Amino acid sequence: MTNSKNRFGNKFIGAHVSAAGGVDNAPLRAREIGANAFALFTKNQRQWVAKPLEEKTISAFKANCALLGFSPQQILPHDSYLINLGAPEAEKLEKSRLAFIDEMERCQLLGLNLLNFHPGSHLEKISEKACLYLIAESINLAHQAVPDVVAVIENTAGQGSNLGWRFEHLAEIIEQVEDKSRVGVCLDTCHTFAAGYDLRTPEACEATFAEFERVVGMHYLRAMHINDSKVKLASKVDRHHALGKGEIGWDCFEYIAKDSRFDSIPLILETIEPELWPQEIEQLRKYHLSSIA
């Protein structure tokens, strides 16, 4: 049952907002769209190196989050797209690992404890097994370098040589991570669907999440990306769409909004029409609140 203090219910619903002009602007942009969760890049996602966060920016970010009621468990930083923690070439792997540690350090400075990342790609040069081992080893090295921050592996659509599209890939990485309290999964609905796991009906959702529980374990689910898909089931192509406009449809998103297994984790829109985010957030919240009234 919600009360006036908890008008959002038990769901953390938001979107990946811009940090242009400074990361301290991200919580303001999230609240403008009615969100009580958000994702952000803590640096330019298409550059290897960024200048360190300034103390005044860190303080302003923390102050804005406190003012607007965003706790660390409602915020999902995303790392750079350049990083490949399973890179087959030693130089690229080392560069990726150093960049990932830097991303974790930035999270720590901002008082955040989750870091969402794409697992990695073998580039057709090493085996899947070798690549998954390198990804796990990269996480272990980052854990040794930076305390507290949880490495949140995002499942992928299966494009090219990217790993992480099968639940078994995620399980194999986690199995090789030493500190399992600091590793988790972010399930992207578009990626899940594109990889071949059906989400179009409540029954399909039930089966897919039962499979995730069997192979990985729901206790590892630390976040979700809520996206419809422009492409058909098992297409292995990553093309996000606005909710209800794609191949998945609203039944899936209503299912997630009403199911308590997805409470208290960031549920982040990365849909392609940001002008629709306020309506998408409002609709998801309506579904959620109707289920707990």
UniProtKB/Swiss-Prot annotation:
Function, as annotated: Endonuclease IV plays a role in DNA repair. It cleaves phosphodiester bonds at apurinic or apyrimidinic (AP) sites, generating a 3'-hydroxyl group and a 5'-terminal sugar phosphate.
Protein name (database record): Probable endonuclease 4
Catalytic activity: Endonucleolytic cleavage to 5'-phosphooligonucleotide end-products
One Pfam family of this chain: AP_endonuc_2
Cofactor(s) listed in the protein's UniProt record: Zn(2+)
SMART domains listed in its UniProt record: AP2Ec
Gene name of the record: nfo
Organism taxonomic ancestry: Bacteria, Pseudomonadati, Pseudomonadota, Gammaproteobacteria, Vibrionales
Organism this protein belongs to: Vibrio vulnificus (strain YJ016)
Binding site for Zn(2+) 3: 191, 238, 240
GO molecular function: deoxyribonuclease IV (phage-T4-induced) activity; DNA binding; DNA-(apurinic or apyrimidinic site) endonuclease activity; phosphoric diester hydrolase activity; zinc ion binding
